[in-house]
Amino acid sequence: MTDAPNLKGFDARLREEAAEEPTLEIPEQPPTKKTQIIAIYGKGGSGKSFTLANLSHMMAEMGKRVLLIGCDPKSDTTSLLFGGKNCPTIIETATKKKLAGEEVKVGDVCFKSGGVFAMELGGPEVGRGCGGRGIIHGFELLEKLGFHDWDFDFVLLDFLGDVVCGGFGLPIARDMAQKVIVIGSNDLQSLYVANNVCNAVEYFRKLGGNVGVAGIVINKDDGTGEAQAFAREVGIPILAAIPADEELRRKSAAYQIVGSHATPWGKLFEELAGNVADAPPLRPRPLSPDALLALFETDEETRVVDLVPATDEDLRGSNAAPKKSLEVIYDDV
């Protein structure tokens, strides 16, 4: 029988951790080489890992030096490159090495496949710690490994777009990336996340930031056109439209790379690689919630919904019977 965890003061410890200021420092000196650092955001399940693994593989085939970093706590960004095998994460490895009194080496966390260099930042276990702070800590460890001295043409960062805390917004908030790419489909949920990312970019542009949105990759495109309409309204280009193809789905499920000149989809990913490299960072025009919903309106008459305020009696239900007053009433004398 295992001992029950000690939760005394757990809430206070979490608050203290959240209140700490990140220590990650961004070098202020001019870069010595032109490396494109690109942050890719999208809703969970939108196909970020599939798109990035195949994009990075195609870039490597085209002679580019590419580093793919998974910044999603699921730590599955790079698994497609390694036939389904998960890389040991930077945070997990650093913890084990620290307990053993050893230093983390590049070879412990960075691995090669098809010419692509790949690693996973990782994150805390479920219910233990903050995923955003895990991202910050992971980049601090990358700094110690010499991240800014590495020689790459492209560094691709895969970020979860559903979470809005500061750690996941680090590339936007601190100008760590030159540009952002969003992944979306023709569904409201994925475009809602893409619009939130555009909102974050616009917010930090107003504060003097330089990061812009280079475009959107439409994944699982079924031809209904909502994602194309979103891109047009927000003012960002479509970098590629990956079709909703059953063969592509099977290849992805079997951890097979399709971003290669040896496959029928090679030309699609070659064009995507060129567009990603050449697309400039743009200032988006994020949509209001109503404008986003309007993209999905049909030709039928728009349904008008009134917001009816609830009352205290509504919320109490069967307990809403009037209570007897405790007021003392005196007889007239």
Swiss-Prot record:
Binding sites annotated in the UniProt record for [4Fe-4S] cluster: 130, 165
Positions contributing to Mg(2+) binding: 49
Pathway, per record: Porphyrin-containing compound metabolism; bacteriochlorophyll biosynthesis
Catalytically driven reaction(s): 3-deacetyl-3-vinylbacteriochlorophyllide a + 2 oxidized [2Fe-2S]-[ferredoxin] + ADP + phosphate = chlorophyllide a + 2 reduced [2Fe-2S]-[ferredoxin] + ATP + H2O + H(+); bacteriochlorophyllide a + 2 oxidized [2Fe-2S]-[ferredoxin] + ADP + phosphate = 3-acetyl-3-devinylchlorophyllide a + 2 reduced [2Fe-2S]-[ferredoxin] + ATP + H2O + H(+); 3-deacetyl-3-(1-hydroxyethyl)bacteriochlorophyllide a + 2 oxidized [2Fe-2S]-[ferredoxin] + ADP + phosphate = 3-devinyl-3-(1-hydroxyethyl)chlorophyllide a + 2 reduced [2Fe-2S]-[ferredoxin] + ATP + H2O + H(+)
Enzyme Commission code(s) on record: 1.3.7.15
Quaternary structure, from the entry: Homodimer. Chlorophyllide reductase is composed of three subunits; BchX, BchY and BchZ.
Cofactor(s) the protein needs: [4Fe-4S] cluster
Enzyme class at the top of the EC tree: oxidoreductase
Family named by the database record: Belongs to the NifH/BchL/ChlL family.
Keyword Nucleotide-binding: yes
Note accompanying the cofactor annotation: Binds 1 [4Fe-4S] cluster per dimer.
Single Gene Ontology MF annotation: oxidoreductase activity, acting on the CH-CH group of donors, NAD or NADP as acceptor
Encoding gene (name): bchX
List of residues binding ATP: 45-50, 74, 219-220
Protein role: Converts chlorophylls (Chl) into bacteriochlorophylls (BChl) by reducing ring B of the tetrapyrrole.
Keyword rRNA processing: no
Region listing for Disordered, in residue ranges: 1-22
Entry keywords, A to Z: 4Fe-4S, ATP-binding, Bacteriochlorophyll biosynthesis, Chlorophyll biosynthesis, Iron, Iron-sulfur, Magnesium, Metal-binding, Nucleotide-binding, Oxidoreductase, Photosynthesis
Cited Pfam families: Fer4_NifH
GO biological process: one example: photosynthesis
Protein name: Chlorophyllide reductase 35.5 kDa chain
SUPFAM superfamilies for the chain: P-loop containing nucleoside triphosphate hydrolases
